[in-house]
Amino acid sequence: MTILDGQRVIAIEEHYYDDQVTKHFQGLDGKLGGFIKDKIVDVGEGRIASMDECGIDVQVLSHGAPSTQKLDAESGPAVATAANDHLYQICQANPDRLAGFAALATANPKAAVDELERAVTKLGMKGAMIHGLTGGELFIDDQQFWPIFERAEALDVPIYLHPGIPHQKVIDVYLKDYIKQYPGFLNAGWGFTMETATASIRLVLSGVFEKYPNLKIILGHLGETLPFLMWRIDLALNRPGNDGVAFRDIFTSHFYITTSGFFSDPALMLCIQEMGVDRILFAIDYPFVPNEPGPKWMETVMLNAEDKAKILHRNSERLLRM
């Protein structure tokens, strides 16, 4: 590799589609990923060749949104189990190059807890990824989902909160006027950020981190705007009339953020200033974002070799035990 004299490069938010999951996608969810259809289903030679060409040693794979979050409590667990078994087979075909985050059918929290245990202890998954609202309705801070966080803490694995499209009422009021002309406005252009930033703030306010003090959460896209807004959020939540919460302390102690789909020098520098370089991990968001610009950006970004190494592989090696 050319980056940092051949040091390891691990990209941890890299997506694929399993047709046994995507066949359940409906409506707006069914339109996600259409422009990269061939690449997102390629989990073999083409993907590895692209990694080789761009200097990426390892991808941590996760199913693309909305994954299993839209599935019901009855059918969802079997779909998630089959998807994780399939992902295990994908990773075993290239065990030095591919790892995985488990899919969980959160509509059935007990089954999700059991599947997280199985996926980590039997299949070697590095944690789990949860995509947006369960059933299009429920944020992940709802207490029925807390057993998932309890088990993640016990297993010492992170939960990656990935965006999903917002609640339909939010779409109707805030977004629908422009999503026909600009479908990206619904997802990565704003809707995704709105949804996941809200979910993350709610998680802090819920008290889940007091209950599970070693719980670890990952956010993509340089923290979904929250590092930029952290000072103001912390101020607002501690003004007279609020119960008060140590938002900044909780966020910087429990959350990790990745560079997925966000290769901006100023944004990265702000995140380092707010969170410290030890909580930032490299990711690309392949294939929604091409592989090529990510490593090239890291070669030129104004960081010393030690900090680049932390972002590119050391932080992921520590957090995901790679």
Language model features with spans:
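Mid-to-C-terminal alpha-helical segments outside catalytic/metal-binding sites
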Residues: 1-12, 16-58, 85-93, 114-118, ...
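Active-site gating loops and adjacent loop-to-helix segments of metal-dependent hydrolytic enzymes
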Residues: 6, 15-41, 71, 167-194, ...
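Hydrophobic faces of well-ordered beta-strands that scaffold small-molecule active sites
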Residues: 10-14, 59-61, 99-102, 128-130, ...
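Active-site environment of divalent metal-dependent phosphoester hydrolases
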Residues: 17-20, 67-69, 107-111, 136, ...
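Short, conserved clusters of charged catalytic residues that mark active-site
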Residues: 42-46, 143, 147, 200-203, ...
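Active-site gating/metal-coordination segments in enzymes
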Residues: 57, 62-199, 206
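Glycine-enriched alpha-helix->loop->beta-strand junction motifs that scaffold or abut catalytic
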Residues: 123-126, 153-158, 212-214, 251-256, ...
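Aromatic-lined glycan-binding groove of carbohydrate-active enzymes
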Residues: 204-250
